[in-house]
Amino acid sequence: MQWYLVAALLTVLTSSQGILTTLSQSNGKYKYDYATIPFLAELFKLSFSSFFLWKECQSSSPPRMTKEWRSIRLYLVPSVIYLIHNNVQFATLTYVDPSTYQIMGNLKIVTTGILFRLVLKRKLSNLQWMAVVLLAVGTTTSQVKGCGDAPCDSLFSAPFQGYMLGILSACLSALAGVYTEYLMKKNNDSLYWQNVQLYTFGVIFNMGWLIYGDFKAGFERGPWWQRLFNGYSITTWMVVFNLGSTGLLVSWLMKYSDNIVKVYSTSMGMLLTMVLSVYLFNVRATLQLFLGIVICIISLQMYFMPVNMLVELPQALPVTSK
């Protein structure tokens, strides 16, 4: 499968995630425990990967699987990073409003590029660096409200701790992505075997988060497994399937492409969500959204277009004999 087909599908699924999540609400509230969504998505990814790993093991040429603990334990790290990131995310939102947090989240685009260079030793050209910065500018522009709106007034009025936590959140998100790419490419193990290790720890940590929530609430609603499917509808299951499928596509890109492609896919997905929201939820289209889309398209072209298509090479002069 070509990487650009996977990237396009990831863009569609990313844009669908926010829309499906909104549609799963009833009167602006969730009837289900939204903390169960990541757990079920991890369980779906683990089941999917386990099935196809089993299919590979039944073939005439068994897949390569590194089973030493010193290798397996490395797959624990992304789950730890995401656990820290989730806590930092909640802490950040106590200091800043959601709009400011979303705008600061675009810093992960640039930090991904920096870690891409430092950790994976992948060099970007000057033009590609400009494209990455433009992508961050474009996505930020699309999310900025009009200067007469409250979100615009509050953008620079948050406490200093809020901005520091927002930067830390962006760095942790980028670090998790870059580290996952390092894991996927460090050997020639089967993608499904790598996924099984990654998602096993994901299931364990998400289950631990649900148990922690029960203890924190004093088991007022009973243990998490008794209310696991409470309030679930067809739309809710679509959210689970969408989130799980998105994770599987991301792991494919980490293995066979890179983090920058993933960043472009998810960023374009966010822009597509905004455009679709104009038609589905009567959200007002803004000049900022239009300008952000234009900037991101220019960035996309700058990053992926071959150099010989960007510069018209001079034609060789005909040789004349004297």
UniProtKB/Swiss-Prot annotation:
Chain ranges passing through the membrane: 3-23, 34-54, 76-96, 101-120, 127-144, 158-178, 199-219, 234-254, 263-283
Origin superkingdom: Eukaryota
Topological type in the membrane: Multi-pass membrane protein
PANTHER family for this protein: NUCLEOTIDE-SUGAR TRANSMEMBRANE TRANSPORTER
Entry coiled-coil feature ranges: none
Cytoplasmic compartment spans: 1-2, 55-75, 121-126, 179-198, 255-262
Similarity comment: family membership: Belongs to the nucleotide-sugar transporter family. CMP-Sialate:CMP antiporter (TC 2.A.7.12) subfamily.
Function summary: Sugar transporter involved in the transport of CMP-sialic acid from the cytoplasm into the Golgi. May transport important nucleotide sugars such as CMP-Kdo (2-keto-3-deoxy-D-manno-octulosonic acid) in physiological conditions.
UniProt organism field: Oryza sativa subsp. indica
GO CC, alphabetical: Golgi membrane
Subcellular location(s) of the protein: Golgi apparatus membrane
Protein name: CMP-sialic acid transporter 1
Keyword annotations of the record: Golgi apparatus, Membrane, Sugar transport, Transmembrane, Transmembrane helix, Transport
One of the record's GO molecular function terms: pyrimidine nucleotide-sugar transmembrane transporter activity
Ranges facing Lumenal side: 24-33, 97-100, 145-157, 220-233, 284-286
One Pfam family here: Nuc_sug_transp
Gene coding for it: CSTLP1
